[in-house]
Amino acid sequence: MLKQVEIFTDGSCLGNPGPGGYGAIMRYGKHEKIFSAGFRLTTNNRMEMMAAIVALEALTQPCAVVLSTDSQYVRQGITSWIHNWKKRGWKTTDKKPVKNVDLWKRLDAALSHHDITWKWVKGHAGHVENERCDELARNAAGNPTLDDVGYTSEA
């Protein structure tokens, strides 16, 4: 039987593009792990994705994961859009390169060993874990220490 894990995520960007950060909380039973980092120049969507990626990549064995995000971009991208992007060689319907393809590929790989249920939560609506992740992300964005090497101005 797979371990049951809950992951809560949020991303933040001051300027979009601008300094950004992510926050994630991973919960297994009574155990909780916090993830957070800030980047000097990035976008909100990239930080939303990084929150999910970092938490999923921290799992050391296949798990049943309920991942809560307030990002429709991440939830729709991974549950709907990604299948056709992959079929088209990571191109959109109008044959343009998919934005943030480096992170979509990384997220896709991070999901491959797990049974994932995606849950959308309304941001800034009093959801306790989402509010905590938002605070982690905003604090990280306010003190960026990393370079987002995959960020390009077209992303």
Swiss-Prot record:
One GO process term, biological-process aspect: DNA replication, removal of RNA primer
Residue sites binding Mg(2+) 2 per the record: D10, D134
Keyword Magnesium belongs to the record: yes
Pfam families membership: RNase_H
Subcellular locations according to the entry: Cytoplasm
Positions contributing to Mg(2+) 1 binding: D10, E48, D70
Cofactor(s) the record lists: Mg(2+)
Cofactor note text: Binds 1 Mg(2+) ion per subunit. May bind a second metal ion at a regulatory site, or after substrate binding.
GO cellular component assignments: cytoplasm
Reaction catalysed by this enzyme: Endonucleolytic cleavage to 5'-phosphomonoester
Family, similarity comment: Belongs to the RNase H family.
Function in brief: Endonuclease that specifically degrades the RNA of RNA-DNA hybrids.
Name assigned to this protein: Ribonuclease H
Organism of derivation: Erwinia tasmaniensis (strain DSM 17950 / CFBP 7177 / CIP 109463 / NCPPB 4357 / Et1/99)
Gene this chain is encoded by: rnhA
